[in-house]
Regions:
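Surface-exposed peri-terminal alpha-helical interaction modules
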Residues: 1-295
Length: 295
């Protein structure tokens, strides 16, 4: 095939993608905004929300906008699902809440994966895009602020549930009802996923503009302050319970590494209960000489 020196296959393809495409299976034109799929999802409006080809300051700006717009949509969904969680906890519908918590966890974990796409952008390219972002910062994100607010409401709903059941977080982990323990673990999954997303954002900032006291984000704050935000929990009482459990932990009642456990009922003694009566288990007598390091 002979082409002129100025012919560009890429340019031809780019132009084709900007026009309606004929789907031979459907025998219909897709992209005119007339098909049910396009009408329902409002694809003409959705796909026009990004800067046009001639408006972008860099090729990667399309990726930058798409990822951030997608994050806002997912955060909107996570926030609305969290509102439903509040309603479910308030009516003691723990099975329904458990299923919805799994959904929220998957959504928030997906946010971290999406940010990974932006890591393919080199820092010099981002510095070009950055000039056109004004003073914008992640703190201005409607989705981020919505989800934080929704999570606050969920934390209060959790407290109301515990009050109705006459339970505390610490008591639940010391032999309380299994359904509440499962709920605690799933709430922690959400919190851990959220903090993981914040950490992914921190790492993205680190590899694009750097993290240092001398490096200012667009809002004027040093990027170093992002490190502290990563560990701010959504459900503090669940994390505090870990600290309290460890503070009241007792070494007595375990088994010396490598020693026989014959005659000892597995799990018969709580790590937080008073020590067993001497002689209840033949292995308890020699524990004082056991190694004392966590591994």
């Amino acid at each position: 095939m002979h082409t002129s020196p100025g012919y560009s296959f890429a340019e031809k393809l780019r132009q084709e993608l900007d026009t309606p495409l004929f789907n031979p299976l459907l025998k219909k034109w897709v992209g005119r905004g007339e098909l049910d799929y396009e009408v329902y999802l409002k694809t003409p409006q959705l796909l026009s929300l990004q800067s046009g080809e001639t408006e972008r300051v860099a090729h990667d700006e399309l990726m930058f906008q798409v990822v951030h717009q997608a994050q806002e949509l997912w955060l909107k969904l996570a926030s609305r699902e969290t509102v439903e969680l509040v309603a479910e906890l308030d009516r003691d519908a723990l099975w329904a809440a458990s299923a919805r918590l799994e959904r929220v966890v998957r959504i928030v974990r997906g946010l971290s994966s999406e940010l990974g796409v932006l890591e393919t952008m080199t820092p010099d390219t981002y510095q070009v895009i950055r000039r056109s972002l004004g003073n914008g910062s992640g703190q201005e994100s409607p989705g981020y602020n919505m989800f934080r607010k929704a999570a606050e409401g969920l934390a209060l709903a959790f407290e109301r549930l515990l009050a109705r059941r006459g339970q505390t977080v610490l008591g639940i982990y010391r032999g309380g009802p299994d359904d509440l323990k499962r709920l605690c673990e799933q709430l922690l999954d959400v919190d851990e996923a959220f903090q993981g997303w914040l950490h992914a954002h921190f790492q993205l900032v680190r590899r694009t503009i750097g993290v240092d006291r001398s490096v200012k984000a667009l809002d004027g704050l040093p990027t170093q302050v992002l490190a502290g935000r990563m560990t701010l929990p959504l459900f503090r009482s669940l994390w505090d319970a870990r600290v309290e459990l460890t503070a009241s932990w007792r070494r007595e009642g375990g088994h010396a590494p490598g020693a026989s456990r014959e005659g000892c009922m597995e799990g018969a003694m709580s790590a937080y209960a008073p020590p067993m009566v001497s002689g209840a288990c033949p292995m308890h007598a020699g524990l004082s000489s056991a190694p004392r390091g966590d591994s």
